[in-house]
Amino acid sequence: MAKMTTLKMKERLEKELNKPNRQFAYERDSDTLSVTQNGKKVTLAIPQIIANYENDGEAAIEKIIYYVEEGFLAASGNIELKNNTANIYPVVRATSFPDTTKAGEVLLTDEHTAETKIFYAFDLGKSYRFIEKNMLEKEGLSHEEVRKAAFDNLGKLEIPLKKDSVNGNDFYFVRTNDGYDASRLLNVSFLQQMREKLTGEMVLAVPHQDVLIIGAIKDNTGYDVLAHMTMDFFADGLVPITSLPFVYNNGKLEPIFIMAKNRLKE
């Protein structure tokens, strides 16, 4: 495979995503390509896409195209919340994630941890749209009604687990690719069940939108493996969240910083 450069990837993306109503803008300083359609903008980090391309080949390009097309489709449609609350889910994002749209509309959010924030989304099948506060006002819904519906729906999602073990440390992965893998971190009853089931310290990570990692950590090797694993997932994700894992104690999530062979608490 010929080496993919920034210029080649930029040109490839512009060719694949080109449509009459779209504009492209390349930012050299941040090495990003912005795609704008009808006032809606998607920003693509080219180095990350190149890294994924080197690992996955054409599948990485296809995934980006799908992500952009579905994103614009979701942004362009009108949604009705009141009679479709079964389609509302909570979504985890980094605290740095913008809480307003490009048009200046404020998104519906809740506080979560020092590293994460809860947003609310309306599921569209292959994608979802973030819920804005003005949507609630138009339909006469309260924040609490949306929150309750979202968490009720989250509790109905299946949570298939894949297990791996390293030197007595057990790791469980949730990777359904339904858009809500990281959201399972918000399922309190699931976390409580896992805490009762696991031995060792229970540590969780949501490096990006499409994975939840749960570790039953027994020693420094376990922390070391989790740290490397979380960083790898964080670098590969289309929607990164946080590279910091969380210790789960007494029903609370506390971010921790882990260095190789060592665990440094808050």
Swiss-Prot record:
Pfam families: DUF1444. InterPro entries: DUF1444. It comes from the Bacteria. Belongs to the UPF0354 family. This is UPF0354 protein lin1649. It comes from Listeria innocua serovar 6a (strain ATCC BAA-680 / CLIP 11262).
